[in-house]
Every structure is written in structure tokens, then in C-alpha cells.
Amino acid sequence: MAKTLYEKLFDAHVVFEAPNETPLLYIDRHLVHEVTSPQAFDGLRAHHRPVRQPGKTFATMDHNVSTQTKDINASGEMARIQMQELIKNCNEFGVELYDLNHPYQGIVHVMGPEQGVTLPGMTIVCGDSHTATHGAFGALAFGIGTSEVEHVLATQTLKQGRAKTMKIEVTGNAAPGITAKDIVLAIIGKTGSAGGTGHVVEFCGDAIRALSMEGRMTLCNMAIEMGAKAGLVAPDETTFNYVKGRLHAPKGRDFDEAVEYWKTLKTDDGATFDTVVTLRAEEIAPQVTWGTNPGQVISVTDIIPDPASFSDPVERASAEKALAYMGLQPGVPLTDVAIDKVFIGSCTNSRIEDLRAAAEVAKGRKVAPGVQALVVPGSGPVKAQAEAEGLDKIFIEAGFEWRLPGCSMCLAMNNDRLNPGERCASTSNRNFEGRQGRGGRTHLVSPAMAAAAAVTGHFADIRSIK
């Protein structure tokens, strides 16, 4: 029987399945951070259980860390407690930890792939919704809750029901300046923020194959923003070349044998999907969200929509509420909307290619008066590589702030946040009310578009900036 990639990955990891019971899956990798793990470790301690597979468990600090100093106290008392608990728990249970002073420390979904912890064919979980990022490698990766974190620590397994399957095919070739971020925002604009609910999404088509691994990670990172359980891209030579030689990747003959298996990880001819969505890459322009969910998105050349133009009463009411929160008026061109802050970072867009794209725009220009612009590399290795290439100097000379690695202003759990009423062009993944700070107004864009907003003081079409 022909199978989809998701069905192959799921079936390969079933440990036990009985009639009328949820299947039990084996988990190959468990990624841990300071926010969703303390109670899970406490649960192990209370029942005198060890971590079953400490060698398959990797921890880092990211959500709470300050991006201005390595001082554990800098983001407040709650942050300090969570980070100190992670240090204590990893020491006690034998889990490898990339702490504030470790050269590999960074955002968990940046660290995993760059260290070769993430490999094709794996099941990967983390107490974080954007675990879907790792699906870019042809791995079944999804976020879990704290009680499930404890279950995986204790058993290296997890009960999971089968999801529905969705194929999203992006045909043709994207125009110059159009990035993975624009593609995924255009997809979510078409499906809506709940269009993938109950599904695991496989992204395919010529435009997807043309993406680098970093672009594919951006794509899968935001699968969750259309309501999907996970996102997948079938592994290919691009994947294998990225993985080869990384710290935790197989070596020598083991790598060659792994590649032979990884090549089988693709949807069979004749396999059927529950839902199919198609987009044409050449029709995708630079995208900017205007509302308070990622599905409220338009091209940068469009005008702010009128809620009256929505036929669905729920969408109309949502648009009215979003415009009121965002302080926007229907009919205003997006390029007339001024911004206060710019955030280039997050598990969506903080890798070296993202920083190069932003630096290309920033080079020889200056951040507009009254705008604060932050560049936050996703990890220690990304920061080191950017500095080796001189990107930090380009940003600093242009008036951007060059920060230490961390989740930063994506989620306002640290000391980087928006003040009430401030408008931000952000490369992160969520534009919900208050996501970047109470009363903050978030517009999601690509790194190049964020840099363009920083130097012009408003949203600008990257295609017109030479």
C-alpha cells in the first residue's frame, strides 16, 4: 500500500498498538529548555525515576535569557529560577546542557539542527510548539506539554494518535527577493490560521525543493501557525549535504548507510492525502501581516483590508477587532505604515542566511530616526559565523543593536519587549495580541523586509530597494 512520508515515519516508530487504543511511539530525540521542563523533572524526582535515555536528551537555555549579558539574573527572578532549575536538573539526571556560557547555547530549534542532533527519519519532541521546525529534515517533530515532557523523560515513548495528511505544493520558481518566510506567510494567508488543524503537512513542489535547509526550517517552523500538528519536507541531497559532518551526525560508513535509508523517506507514488493545497510561487510577493494572527496577511503592495470586504461574519468580526488593536485604518497602503521597532531573530529567522539577507539591506544605510532595531543571532555558532563574515560590523555601523543569542523579543519572556502601542516589524512567527509585550503591535515579515523597514522607518517593498 502506497504511503505518505508522514505515514512512513509514524509507522516506523510504533512501539505498541492495540485495538481502540492510541498508538505508543518511540521518541528518538528529546529537546529540553528552561520553561517547560522544571515540573517534568520534579515529577521524575517524586517517583524516583531516572531519565531513561539521557544520551537522546539535549537541553539549552533560550526563552528567558538576556540578549545583552550572560548574567543569569538579568531577566528577572522567575527567569533566574527557571534557568537555575535547568542547571540543577541536567546535572542530577545526566542530561547534556548548553548553558549561558556554552559556545553552542542558543534557541533550541536552531541548536538541534546545527549540532546534528536533528536527523532525517527521527521522531523529535520538545516542550515548545515550534518543534515543527525539525520537520525540514524529514523528521516527525512536534511540540508537547509538560506532562508529556515528563513521560518522554521517563519512558522515551509517547502516546500519539494518527493525524490527517495534507499536501501543500508550491509550483514554479519564486521571484528574486521572495523568501521562505514570504512563501509560508502566503500559504497561511490561503489556508487561514486553522486550515491545517488535525493535519501533518508535507510541503513539496519545485519552489520548496529550491529552498536551502534554513529556508525549509522557516517553512516548517510556521506549519503550526496554520494549525497543523507538524510540517515535513522529504529529505534530499540538500538535506544530506547539510547534515554531513555535524557533531552528532553519523560518520563514515554509518553516514553512507543512513543516507541510503533516508532516501526512502518520501511519499510513494499513488499515496493519497486528505487535503491538497496548491500555490504558484511566481505569484507570491513580499508578505506582511496586518492583523493579530498569521493568516491576516497581505502583500506589501496591498492596502489594509476593509472588514466589510469579508463575507464570513466570523472573519469580519476578527478583522474589526484586529484593526482596532493594531491601530490601523482600512484602505491605508501598507507602505505608509510607520514602525517603532524592528526585531530580526527567533527560531523562524535567526540563522546565518537570515542575517546575511538583512545585512545586505542594512549595508551602507542607517536605521531611521526614532526606530530601535535588534539583531539577535539564533545561537553561539551563528553569532560567531556572522562576526567572522563581518555582519556584526555592518549592522552596528547602520545603527542596529547586535545582541547575544536567545529567543529575545519573539515572546517577551525576557527583558526584550514592546511597550504598549509600539509597532514592530518582526521576523518571528506569531503576531497575537501581547505576544511581544503588553499592547505591542506585531507585523511578521522576512529578514530582508525587516531590515528595509528599519532603514526607511516604514514597511517597504524589498524589490524596490537597490
Swiss-Prot record:
Official protein name in the record: 3-isopropylmalate dehydratase large subunit
Lineage of origin: Bacteria, Pseudomonadati, Pseudomonadota, Gammaproteobacteria, Enterobacterales
Catalytic reaction(s) noted: (2R,3S)-3-isopropylmalate = (2S)-2-isopropylmalate
UniProt subunit comment: Heterodimer of LeuC and LeuD.
Cofactor: [4Fe-4S] cluster
Molecular functions (GO terms): 3-isopropylmalate dehydratase activity; 4 iron, 4 sulfur cluster binding; metal ion binding
A Pfam family of this chain: Aconitase
Pathway(s) annotated for this protein in UniProt: Amino-acid biosynthesis; L-leucine biosynthesis; L-leucine from 3-methyl-2-oxobutanoate: step 2/4
Domain of life: Bacteria
Cofactor annotation remark: Binds 1 [4Fe-4S] cluster per subunit.
Protein family per UniProt: Belongs to the aconitase/IPM isomerase family. LeuC type 1 subfamily.
Record key words, sorted: 4Fe-4S, Amino-acid biosynthesis, Branched-chain amino acid biosynthesis, Iron, Iron-sulfur, Leucine biosynthesis, Lyase, Metal-binding
Organism expressing this protein natively: Salmonella typhi
Top EC class of this enzyme: lyase
Gene: leuC
Function noted in UniProt: Catalyzes the isomerization between 2-isopropylmalate and 3-isopropylmalate, via the formation of 2-isopropylmaleate.
E.C. number(s) listed in UniProt: 4.2.1.33
Binding site for [4Fe-4S] cluster: 347, 407, 410
